[in-house]
Amino acid sequence: MSRAPAVGMSIEHRRLREKLCRELAQSEHDAVVHTAREAARLRACPPAEKLRAIAAHAEYLRPRLDALLIPDQPFGIRIGRLVGEMFSGLRHLVADRVLSAERSYRATLLGLRHGIDVAWLLRDVTRREDNIRLFRFCDDLIAEREVLLREAERALVWFADHPSIAMASCAHTALGSGAATPSAALP
């Protein structure tokens, strides 16, 4: 596959990079917000602990991501995060209230996978632009986050061992009523 260094191509690469940067900022915002909310709903159980680890990782990377993205796109990155906050709010107020605990957990994992996919594509775009700092950031995010995501995916088995919690709606789980709460099911 050849890389033609045409002027039009570099403009298109820049536009694609800017779009992906906004999308990554939004996704990383979600990696903090959604994982923390989901972990709080699930309380003390293996899936919640895996989500807390992912939230901590996203928080840890955020200053580095901000240093790379905000100077080039201060407005665009803030808009990306604002959009992320709007979708997070909608998800919290509507979707998460009607989804079962395990389905909401899987939806969170799906969002995390999307973020890793964005990082992979952004990594390839930055490689073509010789943007080494952003390339390395994507490499680091991917290497660490994929491990954390695999661990969170393996924690799905916990729901098989706790079917009443798995089937409880998140609204029910979040209210902490009876044996449908993860902490009530633990010894």
Task: Label every model-predicted segment.
Residues 17-38, 85-137:
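Acidic/histidine-rich alpha-helical segments that form the ligand environment
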Residues 1-13, 19, 179-187:
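Terminal targeting/low-complexity segments that flank the catalytic cores of oxidoreductases
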Residues 108-187:
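Preference for long, well-ordered alpha-helical segments
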Residues 45-84, 152-155:
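Conserved alpha-helical segments that form or flank metal/cofactor-binding pockets of metalloenzymes
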Residues 2-5, 67-107, 167-179:
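Carboxylate-rich helix-loop segments that flank metal/cofactor sites and access channels
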Residues 13-24, 43-64, 104-111, 133-145:
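Alpha-helical scaffold segments that form or flank carboxylate-/histidine-based iron centers
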Residues 32, 59-69, 90-94, 116-123, ...:
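A structural signal for well-ordered alpha-helices, especially hydrophobic packing surfaces
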